[in-house]
């Protein structure tokens, strides 16, 4: 009985790991926000709009370089 529970638990973990490994952008974090390209400053201004049912996250962003510099966008 204990062995069956362990195998069931192990199969569940294997399925989750498999799903994570099939991520098309495996070199990017799966939990933390990152821009598609460029540099971003620390995120701030996270808020939930209950009317729209959406989360909003604000950060400084430079799409043209991987370091801080102008132009910066919000």
Swiss-Prot record:
Catalytic activity as recorded in UniProt: Hydrolysis of terminal non-reducing beta-D-fructofuranoside residues in beta-D-fructofuranosides
Glycosylation sites: 23, 64
UniProt signal peptide: 1-19
Active site: 42
Pfam families: Glyco_hydro_32N (PF00251)
Any one GO CC term of the record: extracellular region
A Gene Ontology BP annotation from the UniProt entry: sucrose catabolic process to fructose-6-phosphate and glucose-6-phosphate
Binding site for substrate: 39-42, 60
Keyword Hydrolase among record annotations: yes
Disulfide-bonded cysteines: none
Keywords, sorted A to Z: Glycoprotein, Glycosidase, Hydrolase, Signal
GO molecular function, one term: sucrose alpha-glucosidase activity
Keyword Signal appears in the UniProt entry: yes
InterPro entries for the chain: Glyco_hydro_32_AS, Glyco_hydro_32_N, Glyco_hydro_beta-prop_sf
EC code(s) of this entry: 3.2.1.26
PANTHER family, per the entry: EXOINULINASE INUD (AFU_ORTHOLOGUE AFUA_5G00480), INVERTASE 2
Family per record: Belongs to the glycosyl hydrolase 32 family.
Official protein name in the record: Invertase 3
Species this chain originates from: Saccharomyces cerevisiae
Organism lineage string: Eukaryota, Fungi, Dikarya, Ascomycota, Saccharomycotina
